[in-house]
From Swiss-Prot:
Signal peptide: 1-16
Record-given protein name: Larval cuticle protein 1
One Gene Ontology MF term: structural constituent of chitin-based larval cuticle
InterPro entries: CHIT_BIND_RR_consensus, Cuticle_Struct_Prot, Insect_cuticle
Keywords per UniProt: Cuticle, Signal
Domain Chitin-binding type R&R: from-to ranges: 49-110
Impact upon substituting residue 129 to V: In strain: 0101.3, 0101.4, 0101.5, 0101.7, 0101.9, MSH22, MA28, MA32, MSH38, SP138, SP235 and SP295
An annotated GO cellular component: chitin-based extracellular matrix
Consequence recorded when altering residue 52 to Y: In strain: SP235
Function: Component of the larval cuticle.
UniProt keyword Methyltransferase, yes or no: no
Any Pfam family matching the protein: Chitin_bind_4
Length: 138
């Protein structure tokens, strides 16, 4: 019983010590000074039985627009001015294939090597027949 009490006492002290560890304050410079006082310049939303349309314009040049249909497909875009002063825009589709963003600032995968592309095309043109399943009775 004494060991049992000691184990829980040690665990309690350890947990209390972890709870009082100070967390350093980290400053994250984000955005621009005018972002702090940004105001909504226009906002519109129209929700209907067959879908919706919505858009937003903020005084610091942030914009958002989207529309959706009754099947859950959404098309939209959002944009802002980067800290470097560049206009950044992302267009997207969200549907049964997932979220598909497109924009110049997004990374793109390298091209598929020609040999791999030929191999994939050959495999698609020559599908393998399923192998028969053999059951052995013992």
């Amino acid at each position: 019983m004494f060991k049992f009490v000691m184990v829980f006492a040690v665990l309690g002290v350890a947990a209390a010590g972890v709870a009082h560890v100070p967390h350093p304050q980290v400053s994250h410079p984000v955005g621009r000074s005018e972002d702090v006082h940004a105001e909504v310049k226009s906002e519109h939303s129209d929700v209907r039985a067959d879908g919706f349309d919505a858009d937003l314009l903020v005084s610091n040049s942030i914009q958002q627009a989207s529309s959706g249909d009754v099947h859950g497909n959404i098309h939209g875009s959002f944009s802002w001015i980067s800290p470097e002063g560049e206009h950044v825009e992302i267009k997207y589709v969200a549907d049964e294939n997932g979220y598909q963003p497109v924009g110049a600032v997004l990374p793109t995968p390298p091209p598929i090597p020609e040999a791999i592309a030929r191999a994939v095309a050959w495999l698609e043109a020559h599908p393998q027949a399923p192998e028969p399943v053999h059951h052995s009775h013992h």
